[in-house]
């Protein structure tokens, strides 16, 4: 989601020898900023610091060996957009990130990530424009034999929570939760 706080976490990742994937929205890097940027943060219902990641911070994250992935341009629910707008949200974001990092961007994560926010047509589109993996927001353990690299589980990591809380979140199998309760594991 492109928050500056990601950059402040780099020393912790370095100290622990951890490499992470950061899925980035690109609206904060676009020349159009202004009120569109304010609406972006309001839409995310962000309650804390509203400082966006700068281009320099993004390059630092990338040069530290972390993976940069695409998360759309302005974090809209892509499933609610007509097909004609997918390029402006997805391909535009991919192009901006490739320009900023100087590297191919081959990983994508659907904004919001729950099943109602993406479709097989969106998944196919992302694959067709060159993404090698697609992350959902469906929590659960991801293992090499899980299978579909175009439906990877993604579990958030909350820096203000104890590590045990975050590890418990990683153990949740979102698919089992949905099957048992009939509800989404994340909202």
Language-model segments: what does each one mean?
Residues 3-4, 14-116, 151-152:
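Metal-dependent polysaccharide deacetylase catalytic core of the NodB/CE4 family, i.e.
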Residues 3-4, 80-107, 112-187:
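C-terminal active-site subregion of NodB/CE4 polysaccharide deacetylases
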